[in-house]
């Protein structure tokens, strides 16, 4: 099966200059865990909810809430994003996407059509496909779990 058949189409993308609080709002309102980052229309990175959380000051900080807000609004996604993210072309296979995500220990991939971001494929998308195929093949999921099986 091709990536384009399972991906989330037309993902929300952000510019490198977007402040972290704005990225947080987009992620929260849209239920996204990752946002492709563009500079002059070209993919240059990906920012995840984890990147955003790690950029926040710890609870043990001695900064006041006003100082924290001041600093956070000046940090952009460019400063915390993963640069040159692993991508896959839309005509690639789901199996290849799964392998890339496993090899790189990531939860999703920007999907490209040439140099343009046209989608996102995630581990969740792959798992849904797996469950749909299992159901189609008559596997109910009621069997004993295979603890530690790979």
What are these regions (language model features)?
Residues 27, 35-51, 101, 109-124:
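A glycine-centered beta-loop-beta connector
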Residues 14-31, 38-39, 81, 87-105, ...:
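The conserved cystathionine-beta-synthase
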Residues 28-36, 55-57, 62:
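Short, charge-rich amphipathic segments
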Residues 1-10, 48-86, 98-102, 122-150:
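Tandem CBS (Bateman) regulatory domains
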């Amino acid at each position: 099966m091709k990536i384009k058949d399972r991906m989330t189409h037309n993902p929300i993308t952000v510019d490198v200059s977007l402040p972290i609080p704005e990225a947080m709002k987009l992620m929260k309102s849209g239920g996204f865990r990752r946002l492709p980052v563009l500079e002059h229309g070209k993919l240059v990175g990906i920012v995840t909810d984890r990147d955003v959380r790690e950029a926040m000051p710890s609870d043990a900080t001695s900064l006041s809430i006003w100082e924290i807000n001041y600093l956070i609004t000046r940090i952009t996604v460019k400063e915390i994003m993963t640069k040159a993210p692993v991508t896959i072309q839309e005509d690639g296979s789901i199996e290849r996407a799964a392998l890339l995500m496993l090899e790189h220990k990531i939860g999703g991939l920007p999907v490209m059509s040439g140099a343009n971001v046209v989608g996102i494929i995630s581990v969740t998308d792959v798992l849904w496909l797996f469950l749909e195929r299992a159901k189609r093949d008559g596997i109910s999921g009621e069997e004993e779990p295979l603890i530690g099986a790979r």
